[in-house]
Amino acid sequence: MAKEKVLTEQDSLRIIQEMIQKAKAGAHYERGQGPILWGSVIGFAGIMSFLEIYFKWNIPFDWWILTLVALIPQVFIVLNDRKKNIVKTHEARAIDMVWAVFGISIFALVLYGNFIGQITIQLLAEEDITLWKRSGTDGSLASFQMFVPSIASLYLMIYGFPTLVTGVVIRCRSMLIGACICYILFVVSLYTPTVWDMLFIGIAGICNWLIPGIILRRQYLLSVKTKHV
């Protein structure tokens, strides 16, 4: 029977430190990749939507389609983590689940915003109820299309949740500040029209993800550089 190797105290500490470093390197949000990606996309789409509505530009393109395009590099980020066989702590797994629930919630909100108006009209029609609006000029009546008021406010509220949790767990002050900005913008958006809500979403993407992502990326690259010195 082969003699088992006895680990010294120094060997044990070295192994523990290596495991911690692998766990830290495995979280794409700690490397800043995910936050930079989504902060850039949400920030750009929100600001461009605001400019298009405010200045009445006629651009035949939905800026929010960019969020679907961003799923492609996000998949590559996740697959790259798996290929490296990176060790994940319980905290990292919990944060991953928080972001997964966040993604599901955003998808549910998109469905809600796109379908609830028409579905409400159909349900009212089944009860023989029709909505009309009266013209302010000649007093004529026209059918009224149900809409969802200030759904952008709900996005702002949800945006802050995963960032706040992540910021608390990894002790990232910039994420905590970004999440607080999201909740402040949520409250302000309750009193503003949709055009300004689009601007708030763009600002939220920049403050909530892009800026913290850049800070995390710089810290990660500095730690890698220090490690190899």
Q: Where are the predicted features?
A:
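Membrane-helix interface and helix-disruption motif detector
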Residues: F55-W63, F144-F147, T192-F200
